[in-house]
Amino acid sequence: MRESEIEQYLVAKVKEKGGEVRKVKWIGRNGAPDRLVMLKGIHNHAVWVELKAEGLAALFPHTPHERQQHREHERMRAVGQRVVVLDSYAGIDALLP
């Protein structure tokens, strides 16, 4: 499954839960997650999401660009941000119970 299909599923599920998804363009930062998911109610939180094509999250990070992404994700986690890497509908369903 392509990353774009997983992205469409993420957006649909978040909207179904009453939340919002934003595609984020980072200026001067390489490797940052490309989606911000905001949920309300019992899920009242925000989570940064990096999407991958199906099967690639288990290999993350395996390219120089992904190693840079991994370092940036770790920097964000160090200051209390929740960052996840998802590559399947099941991963999205687990994130959005």
Residue ranges and their predicted role:
Residues 1-97:
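Catalytic phosphate/metal-binding cores of nucleic-acid and nucleotide-processing enzymes, i.e., regions
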